[in-house]
Amino acid sequence: IAGDVIDEHQLGSIEYAASHLGAPLIVVMGHTHCGAVHTAINHDPEGYIKFITDKIKAAIGDECDPYKAACLNVKSCEAEIEASLEIQKVEHQEGLRVIGAMYHLENGLVDFI
């Protein structure tokens, strides 16, 4: 999903994977040089892209550094998933973990944040 934005459909799929399929780990992975984050920082797009960038802007606030902004966006998505009562239940009962990560396009490395 562009910009790691989460809506009810994605959250429902994540809840299903955790509660019905037994997924032990949910990783929210952003990446460096993210076009959606760049657009949220530098532009005010029109059309449906605005729904994506508005959600990113809410997550990153006034942060203008693209890497830091992408990390803030990942952490926001992580928090949104963890706010789900279904996810909280599986975390408590089954030990589910939700973590954030950043993939570096330039070298293929992943940082867990």
Roles of regions detected by a PLM:
Residues 31:
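Histidine-centered divalent metal-coordination motifs
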